[in-house]
Amino acid sequence: MSVRARVAALTIVLIAATSAMACGGRFFGKQYEYEEDLYLATDGSAELIVNASIPALVSLRGLPLDVDPATQVDRNKVRALYESPETEVARVSRSWSRDGRRFVQVRMKVRDVRKLDAVAPFSWSHYSLGEEQELRVFRQTMGASALRPGTMQNYGWKGKELVAVRLHLPSRIVDHNARDIDSNEGSAVQRGNILAWEQLLTDRLDGRPISIEVRMDRQSILYTTLWLFAGAFTAAVLLLCGIIWLTMRKGAREAATTS
């Protein structure tokens, strides 16, 4: 293969990867059939991103959407399904395809995560956020899916598809119950203060609960960092003032001795 051909091939791969990530897909790593990313603020407000296949939204949440992969997703209909007094939809992406299924991404602002279960697509979860023993505690329990016995259709699922819930947290994490789906050992906090709970799609369809609990500091990392920065800056200013004062005092003494 010539150098020019290699460059062209690499360019195509990079464009494909960029397009997939822009649409919410994951070019590298695990692939998910349904995932929620919750960016939580200390006051209970949040930003929430849902990436999901249309068949998953129909089967898991009972949303009235067209599962035909040849049909473009009705983005206005998706927006209407997620819009509510508690949520403000910022964007519904263009759909993309994977394994013969169409996927879509929905980005929204959540006014109060504690009321999110009043929104139909999230009514399978119960949310709480409060303070216990000088810590802020977030809990989410994801319950039964909308799938009814005898209604399951063949969407090309092979049984290994995954569902994920990720929390992007504002404060230092003290304790959590996230576990690795493969080893069943406690998961480490990911870079960016992120925790993930994963489950097989088959288990989610069966309604096996996902129990989420996180204990964290009451103050946000940003707030703590700003205070540390302010303290360090104040200490530096005081040190500089001290050096200047000592220098001026030494100069005054030398001048007095000379005279």
Language-model-detected regions and their locations in the chain:
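C-terminal motif of bacterial Sec signal peptides marking the signal peptidase cleavage site
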Residues: 19-22
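Structured domain cores in non-transmembrane regions
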Residues: 53-133, 138
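Bacterial N-terminal signal peptides that target proteins for export
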Residues: 1-10
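Intrinsically disordered, low-complexity linkers and stems that provide flexible hinges
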Residues: 132-233
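A mature extracytoplasmic/lumenal domain signature
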Residues: 38, 50-54, 110-112, 169, ...
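Bacterial signal peptide processing site
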Residues: 24-27
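C-terminal single-pass membrane-anchor helix
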Residues: 218-259
